[in-house]
Amino acid sequence: MATPVNAQCSSKTWELSLYELHRTPQEAIMDGTEIAVSPRSLHSELMCPICLDMLKNTMTTKECLHRFCSDCIVTALRSGNKECPTCRKKLVSKRSLRPDPNFDALISKIYPSRDEYEAHQDRVLAKLNRLHNQQALSSSIEEGLKMQAMHRAQRVRKHQHESDNTTFSGGEDNCDSRSHVSNPSVHSNQEAGPSRKRSRASEDSGAEPDLSHEGGVRSPDPPGGGETGSEIELVFRAHPLLVEKDGYSQTRYVKTTANATVDHLSKYLALRIALEEEVLRGEAEGVTLGEVSEKQYTIYICTGVAGGQYTTLNGSLTLELVNEKYWKVSKPLELYYAPTKEQK
């Protein structure tokens, strides 16, 4: 049975929506008027959806016409599913892509100094990485100082425990030797030799000043008595106000004992700088200790909360006192040096 003609016509009729009925075409600008558009507003149109950076060597998909960087879309097709990252439409291979030189030309027209922009971006990233590495270094130094302090305390306790065990075992030996000496008739002449040696050893140990009168028991050593003083890490920097920028301004990292004084650091600094200056000049003669004095350099420490205030340190102060009085933080002690005014 044939379909009526009016039914065919009604099925092919396009019914306009309310929006389509009332919309008007946009008037074209024909008088040469220029409209200013900021590049930032075009960023979403010129951005690669994969790397979120500006498109580079633009490739367009043939099916859905989405744009990507050449390296980004090729890597995505190799490592992921064979589909468009934006709309998930099927992409068989690189044959589903085509280069878009016109879009690259448009980007180069909008951003003529793109190479300079990328170079600036690389410099900023390198600076951020360098600052991140410095922060990691300072945090690792702090963790190292904490671990050193913890191990040092354990070492002191272990040393005290071992010394106590040694002294008590020595007291038992003395008691045994006295029992052997007091009963010579029980033992044979062959066993009398070792007993006499042990009694003589107990008499010799009894002459030591740190044994008590009862049983020869050794008194416990004072804390840290068998070890050297604790170590302090410090950073030497040139004084920012008293040392010229083109002068000698090397930063030094020193690790020494806490009982070292400021004069020790001044003399060490004078000797090191004199040796390095001779190496730079190429002189063969070495520097004698008589020519180096701790008066050549003055040591300062920054005491201001916001920086800029420097206090001169007395040469007789130990680093432990300086750390307790001025620093009081779990970071390497920061000191500043400058030539003494009389030595300039």
From Swiss-Prot:
It holds the Pfam family zf-C3HC4_2. It catalyses: S-ubiquitinyl-[E2 ubiquitin-conjugating enzyme]-L-cysteine + [acceptor protein]-L-lysine = [E2 ubiquitin-conjugating enzyme]-L-cysteine + N(6)-ubiquitinyl-[acceptor protein]-L-lysine. GO terms for molecular function: chromatin binding; histone H2AK119 ubiquitin ligase activity; ubiquitin protein ligase activity; zinc ion binding. InterPro entries: RAWUL (IPR032443), RING1/RING2 (IPR043540), Znf_RING (IPR001841), Znf_RING/FYVE/PHD (IPR013083), Znf_RING_CS (IPR017907). Keywords: Chromosome, Cytoplasm, Metal-binding, Nucleus, Repressor, Transcription, Transcription regulation, Transferase, Ubl conjugation pathway, Zinc, Zinc-finger. Residues 180-192 have a biased composition (Polar residues). Pathway: Protein modification; protein ubiquitination. GO terms for cellular component: chromosome; cytoplasm; MLL1 complex; nucleus; PcG protein complex; PRC1 complex; ubiquitin ligase complex. A zinc finger (RING-type) spans 48-88. PANTHER family: E3 UBIQUITIN-PROTEIN LIGASE RING1, E3 UBIQUITIN-PROTEIN LIGASE RING1 / RING 2 FAMILY MEMBER. Component of chromatin-associated Polycomb (PcG) complexes. Component of a PRC1-like complex. Component of some MLL1/MLL complex. This is E3 ubiquitin-protein ligase RING2-A. The gene is rnf2-a.
